[in-house]
């Protein structure tokens, strides 16, 4: 077959004209090395700090992602989020152009998820309508509102001595096995019916411990308003490091929409250790205790996101959909100390960032005083302004009495002869200590808490044997529940503005009427306590 040269040229022309050239520009690189979940990638010239990188999928087709943390001249250091055994040298890595995001919204409530927001409770997929970035800038000074609403934990010793407000950061610190998690779980359980969404972030704990916490929350009905973010000890250091930020983003969803949320980080010591591990593997220079130089920033940027935001911020964020409402995210970070050393690097960092600390002591815990709160060094820097008047009126001298009692008790064991005033103070302190004991998973409403503190302040427990103080309290509470339900309801309803001071001539009629209600309620409480004391054997 012979082709005409003219036909050949026409054929070539038509082929050239019909050729579709499309250029797909992608920023991709090559894996240089993989070690302990740390991947060094060459060629990602446009990668951002904290950007998600796409790695080759696993054998079953599950996508693999990493987090770009080190941006160097010739390479990028990244941590793999999840399994990394299938990634090998020479593999292709692509930039996604996105910062790490997790699902947020009410769809997550009642679920147990991992650090990436993926369900791990076997209850099926989560159909969240939104995702949000895990790293955010905390609200500025102008967007914030002062803390003036209480966040009741239901624990007598905390709500009376170291009260926590909505939007506060209150550190729970102590050695291992001193009841730190128990305090946080009780606080979550006590939020039932308080319009508070809770987030519990478990970092570096045993899977069995996390399972026990979830079971306790389910039994108390607290999973109806709680999200559990779990990064157990079996997961990679990267997942443990990221989990706290993921949980914070889930809590911020509610804060920014004019709702109240509580987040528990259990615990930040393990997060700091995970971050140290990642940093050392990335060859970052170590500092004090081998932590990297930015370990303070690790926790400060996380805890500063817990805040109470004003109505203008909420209105601007929701574009006018929510008006006149403030939002709050209250944080209860937990730090584990070694042999009570609060001056170690991470504990001092977090103490300086937070608005107070609840210090749990091993010696008190072993002596059966639970929660084992040391009244001397536990403090709340902003919570007193958020404390309800009902509790504030009764708890004024409790903390001082308890701190002085512990000091006196230490000296009294060496003294053979004590004066009457000292002996009275020791007796009173022993009874207050006994009354502040509380079993786990039994938070108290403010009305019953007030009744307990009232009985102490009025001296009803002074001549009762120390071993009978708790039975006295239990019996008194039962009497109030059965015979004085209306009184308890009055205290619950009016507790925030409670006022028993004598009425002034310039008080409005409404204020005078309110004071009369409070005074009558206190008189009824006094009569009930007097009557019960006579019948108590």
Curated annotation (Swiss-Prot):
MF GO annotations: ADP binding; ATP binding; proton-transporting ATP synthase activity, rotational mechanism
Subcellular location: Cell inner membrane
EC number: 7.1.2.2
Site feature location: Required for activity: 378
Top-rank lineage group of the source organism: Bacteria
Reaction catalysed by this enzyme: ATP + H2O + 4 H(+)(in) = ADP + phosphate + 5 H(+)(out)
Membrane topology category: Peripheral membrane protein
Cellular component terms (Gene Ontology): plasma membrane; proton-transporting ATP synthase complex
SUPFAM superfamilies linked: C-terminal domain of alpha and beta subunits of F1 ATP synthase, N-terminal domain of alpha and beta subunits of F1 ATP synthase, P-loop containing nucleoside triphosphate hydrolases
Keyword terms: ATP synthesis, ATP-binding, Cell inner membrane, Cell membrane, CF(1), Hydrogen ion transport, Ion transport, Membrane, Nucleotide-binding, Translocase, Transport
InterPro entries linked to this entry: ATP_synth_asu-like_sf, ATP_synth_asu_C, ATP_synth_asu_C_sf, ATP_synth_F1_a_nt-bd_dom, ATP_synth_F1_asu, ATPase_a/bsu_AS, ATPase_F1/V1/A1_a/bsu_N, ATPase_F1/V1/A1_a/bsu_N_sf
Protein residues bound to ATP: 174-181
Keyword Translocase appears in the UniProt entry: yes
Similarity comment: family membership: Belongs to the ATPase alpha/beta chains family.
Task of the protein: Produces ATP from ADP in the presence of a proton gradient across the membrane. The alpha chain is a regulatory subunit.
Subunit structure and binding partners: F-type ATPases have 2 components, CF(1) - the catalytic core - and CF(0) - the membrane proton channel. CF(1) has five subunits: alpha(3), beta(3), gamma(1), delta(1), epsilon(1). CF(0) has three main subunits: a(1), b(2) and c(9-12). The alpha and beta chains form an alternating ring which encloses part of the gamma chain. CF(1) is attached to CF(0) by a central stalk formed by the gamma and epsilon chains, while a peripheral stalk is formed by the delta and b chains.
Protein name: ATP synthase subunit alpha
Protein species of origin: Verminephrobacter eiseniae (strain EF01-2)
């Amino acid at each position: 077959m012979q082709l005409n040269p003219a036909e050949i040229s026409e054929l070539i022309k038509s082929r050239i004209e019909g050729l579709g050239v499309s250029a797909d520009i992608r920023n991709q690189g090559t894996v240089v090395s993989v070690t302990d979940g740390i991947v060094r990638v060459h060629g990602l010239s446009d990668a951002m700090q904290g950007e998600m990188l796409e790695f080759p999928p696993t054998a079953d087709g599950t996508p693999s992602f990493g987090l770009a943390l080190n941006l160097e001249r010739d390479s990028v250091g990244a941590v793999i989020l999840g399994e990394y055994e299938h990634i090998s040298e020479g593999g292709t890595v692509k930039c996604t152009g996105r910062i790490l995001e997790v699902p947020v919204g009410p769809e997550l409530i009642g679920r147990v998820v991992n650090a990436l927001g993926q369900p791990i409770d076997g209850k099926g997929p989560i159909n969240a309508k939104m995702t949000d970035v895990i790293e955010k800038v905390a609200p500025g000074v102008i967007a914030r509102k002062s803390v003036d609403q209480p966040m009741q934990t239901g624990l007598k010793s905390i709500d009376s001595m170291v009260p926590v407000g909505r939007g506060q950061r209150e550190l729970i610190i102590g050695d291992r096995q001193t009841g730190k998690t128990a305090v946080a779980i009780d606080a979550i359980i006590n939020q039932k019916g308080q319009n508070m969404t809770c987030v519990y972030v478990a970092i570096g704990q045993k899977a069995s411990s996390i399972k026990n916490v979830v079971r306790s929350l389910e039994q108390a009905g607290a999973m109806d308003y709680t999200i559990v973010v779990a990064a157990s000890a079996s997961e990679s250091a990267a997942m443990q490091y990221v989990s706290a930020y993921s949980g914070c983003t889930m809590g911020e969803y509610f804060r920014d929409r004019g709702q109240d949320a509580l987040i528990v980080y259990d615990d930040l010591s393990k997060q700091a250790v995970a971050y140290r591990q990642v940093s050392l593997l990335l060859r970052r220079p170590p500092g004090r205790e081998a932590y990297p130089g930015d370990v303070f920033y690790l926790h400060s940027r996380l805890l500063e996101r817990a805040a109470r935001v004003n109505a203008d911020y909420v209105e601007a964020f929701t574009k006018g959909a929510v008006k006149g409402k403030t939002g709050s995210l209250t944080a209860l970070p937990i730090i584990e100390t070694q042999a009570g050393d609060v001056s170690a690097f991470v504990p001092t960092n977090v103490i300086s960032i937070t608005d107070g600390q609840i210090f749990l002591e091993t010696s008190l815990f072993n002596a059966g005083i639970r929660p084992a709160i040391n009244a001397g060094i536990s403090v709340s820097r902003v919570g007193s302004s958020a404390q309800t008047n009902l509790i504030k009126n009764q708890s004024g001298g409790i903390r001082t009495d308890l701190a002085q009692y512990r000091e006196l008790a230490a000296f009294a064991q060496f003294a053979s002869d004590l004066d009457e005033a000292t002996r009275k103070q020791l007796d009173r302190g022993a009874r207050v200590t006994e009354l502040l004991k509380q079993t786990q998973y039994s938070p108290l409403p403010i009305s019953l808490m007030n009744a307990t503190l009232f009985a102490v302040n009025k001296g009803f427990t002074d001549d009762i044997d120390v071993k009978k103080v708790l039975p006295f309290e239990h019996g008194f509470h039962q009497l109030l529940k059965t015979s004085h339900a209306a009184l308890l309801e009055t205290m619950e309803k009016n507790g925030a503005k409670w006022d028993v001071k004598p009425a002034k001539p310039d008080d409005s009629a409404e204020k005078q009427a309110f004071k009369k209600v409070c005074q009558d309620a206190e008189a009824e409480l006094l009569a009930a306590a007097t009557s019960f004391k006579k019948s108590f054997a």
